[in-house]
């Protein structure tokens, strides 16, 4: 395209007015070029006397306003063929948007009067709890949320919600399934109040999540027995009721505890009338009943008939420990003729007085109850075990020259009276050195 810029004076004739005159191209093709008479040239000089043609490059503002204001689905008026080539795509998309809005408006205009559906379940009134792993069903009544129970499947929870919705709101209630599925329930729920019907739905629900029990308050313990417990009672998380051999026994124990603390309105596994005149066992009273728990702090007094504190030794305890760990102390005077160490003196301070094949064998004199004393009888110890004295010789046992101990001297010393204690019952004799 070649532009010829010629300036034309405004005082010229009408024939010489500025215009766009596309002359035929030199090669005879279908294209053309624009010429602007800016230098005052006459169009007759070039022989260009073709009519003026106007092309609309953009849509008119009136057409755009009409499309934006009119929400109807009627298509816009057709434009001339040359102008359709330069039309942008956005008016047609605006028309499509208007059609889509008109199609969605009737469906979105109807809102549920019972609130939106649950986000965690496809059923109305059903919610999945990750903490317990169960599907729980709730219904709103008089501004309060009523718990209908926890179930293993979302389908069972949805069925419970439908029954409660029909009982609370009538046949026009929004339910999950068809109303014809509950014809048998409609005949039965007429004789029940709302509270009674809710209790029935709760009895049909699952108890605790852990275990495989279908009864409320019953779970399978890891030891293989059935555990019964109550939750949220006396300010505690749960109250332990005991272990039972059968699942039904645990369920009945839960029912008795629930009736005792919550009355006839308690949610039980079986009919509450079956527990008329039934009393909780004593074992359950000790665990569950918080009124009989004695929380007073005091020191329990010993029984004078069971303990004997007459100053005599009631038993011995023999410890085979290391000398460093031995701390046996004589706590009570044994007998006037028994010379013992002063009170508070450890026997480990004199390890040289006792020598035996078991070097860490020491005597622990301690007063123990008579009923806990083991029976002492003849015991088979090696004959080589004997208690000998080390250190300085005693005058009671004089030694001979180089031939060892004298037989007569040892026999006389054994018959002579001494300050040694009476022999301990058994094969061994213990010697306690005299106090200084």
Swiss-Prot record:
It comes from Oryza sativa subsp. indica. The keyword Transcription regulation applies. It holds the Pfam family AP2. This is APETALA2-like protein 3. Keywords: DNA-binding, Nucleus, Repeat, Transcription, Transcription regulation. One of its GO terms (molecular function) is DNA-binding transcription factor activity. Belongs to the AP2/ERF transcription factor family. AP2 subfamily. The lineage of its organism: Eukaryota, Viridiplantae, Streptophyta, Embryophyta, Tracheophyta. Its main location: nucleus. GO terms for cellular component: nucleus. Probable transcription factor. Involved in spikelet transition. Together with IDS1, controls synergistically inflorescence architecture and floral meristem establishment via the regulation of spatio-temporal expression of B- and E-function floral organ identity genes in the lodicules and of spikelet meristem genes. Prevents lemma and palea elongation as well as grain growth. Regulates the transition from spikelet meristem to floral meristem, spikelet meristem determinancy and the floral organ development. It comes from the Eukaryota. CDD domains: AP2. Residues 1-123 are annotated as: Disordered.
């Amino acid at each position: 395209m070649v532009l010829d810029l010629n300036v034309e004076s405004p005082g010229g004739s009408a024939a010489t007015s500025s215009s766009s005159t596309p002359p035929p191209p030199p090669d005879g093709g279908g294209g053309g070029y624009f010429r602007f008479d800016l230098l005052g040239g006459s169009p007759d000089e070039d022989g260009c006397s073709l009519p003026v043609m106007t092309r609309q490059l953009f849509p008119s503002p009136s057409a755009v306003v009409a499309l934006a204001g009119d929400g109807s689905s009627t298509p816009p008026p057709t434009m001339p063929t040359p102008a359709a080539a330069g039309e942008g795509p956005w008016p047609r998309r605006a028309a499509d948007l208007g059609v889509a809005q008109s199609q969605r408006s009737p469906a979105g205009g109807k809102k549920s009067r019972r609130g939106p559906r649950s986000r965690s379940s496809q059923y109305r009134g059903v919610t999945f709890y990750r903490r317990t792993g169960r599907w729980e069903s709730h219904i709103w009544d008089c501004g309060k949320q009523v718990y209908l129970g926890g179930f293993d499947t979302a389908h069972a929870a949805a069925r419970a919600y439908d029954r409660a919705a029909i009982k609370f709101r009538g046949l026009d209630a929004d339910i999950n399934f068809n109303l014809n599925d509950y014809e048998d329930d409609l005949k039965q729920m007429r004789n029940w109040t709302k509270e009674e019907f809710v209790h029935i739905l709760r009895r049909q629900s699952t108890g605790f999540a852990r275990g495989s029990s279908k009864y409320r308050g019953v779970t399978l313990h890891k030891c293989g027995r059935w555990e019964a417990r109550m939750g949220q009672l006396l300010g505690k998380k749960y109250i332990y009721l005991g272990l039972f051999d059968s699942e039904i026994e645990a369920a009945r124990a839960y029912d008795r505890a629930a009736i005792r603390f919550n009355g006839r309105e308690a949610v039980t596994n079986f009919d509450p009338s079956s527990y008329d005149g039934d009393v909780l066992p004593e074992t359950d009273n000790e665990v569950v009943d918080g009124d009989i728990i004695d929380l007073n702090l005091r020191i329990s007094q010993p029984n004078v008939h069971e303990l004997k504190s007459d100053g005599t030794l009631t038993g011995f305890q023999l410890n085979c420990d290391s000398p460093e760990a031995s701390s046996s102390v004589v706590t009570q005077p044994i007998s006037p003729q028994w010379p013992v160490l002063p009170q508070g003196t450890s026997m480990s301070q004199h390890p040289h007085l006792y020598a035996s094949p078991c070097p860490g064998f020491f005597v622990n004199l301690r007063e123990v109850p008579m009923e806990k004393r083991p029976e002492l009888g003849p015991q088979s110890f090696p004959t080589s075990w004997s208690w000998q004295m080390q250190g300085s010789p005693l005058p009671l046992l004089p030694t001979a020259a180089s031939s060892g101990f004298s037989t007569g001297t040892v026999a006389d010393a054994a018959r002579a009276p001494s300050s040694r204690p009476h022999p301990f019952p058994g094969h061994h004799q213990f010697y306690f050195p005299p106090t200084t």
